[in-house]
Amino acid sequence: MTPEVFYKALEDFDIHLNDFQKEQFDIYFQTLVEWNDKINLTAITEKNDVYLKHFYDSIAPILHGYIKNEPIKLLDIGAGAGFPSIPMKIIYPQLDITIIDSLNKRITFLKQLSEVLHLEGVHFFHGRAEDFGQDINFRAQFDIVTARAVARMQILSELTIPFLKLNGKLLALKAQAVDQELTDAQNALKLLFSQVIENNHYQLPNGDSRYITIVEKKKETPRKYPRKAGTPNKKPL
């Protein structure tokens, strides 16, 4: 997917990038490749692949109408090189973005990236989701939490649901079918007072399958969740 094809694909969804936004995506690509030589951010570095498998893939929540250009608070857990939240921020500048990542090198990259992209309303924190999820400054503070290829839903739900406001939504982006994951996660979702409200299967322009699972928080999360760092992975709910 060349940049021009990327722009055209967005126009099909009535999203028209201005020259500054197009330049932001180009600088994003250049910065990603440059930093990838220093720290391992992605195995995908060919320009057309980055535009398809990172940029286009990341904005799926916008293309499918789950996120609007509004000043909502969005938390991205384990964003790595900034996916999916930074591409969405470029398209919808009103979004207030927070990223938590467990690797400090990635946070350093993201801070530099936000500077060269001239982004405002982006916040980066190094640490574990389990720890931040018990912090009153983060717990129940977000309208939307996104997670792209982070963990199985049984684990991911405990790492993300505590951050949501009541009726807030988790958007889990996956490359594989999640039917079995959702079956395995039934107990976790019940304990966390949350419910799957949609499971959307779609395709990238090249035909690759993708999935967005949307989970809504129905009641306040019990105080004991999330458990201490590492426990959700070792002993899933």
Swiss-Prot record:
Q: Which SUPFAM superfamilies does the entry mention?
A: S-adenosyl-L-methionine-dependent methyltransferases (SSF53335)
Q: Where, subcellularly, is it found?
A: Cytoplasm
Keyword Coiled coil on this protein? Answer: no
Cellular component GO terms, alphabetical: cytosol
Residues bound to S-adenosyl-L-methionine are 78, 83, 129-130, 148
Q: Where is this region: Disordered?
A: 218-237
The main location class comes to cytoplasm
The cross-references to PANTHER family, in alphabetical order and at most eight, read: S-ADENOSYL-L-METHIONINE-DEPENDENT METHYLTRANSFERASES SUPERFAMILY PROTEIN
This protein is called: Ribosomal RNA small subunit methyltransferase G
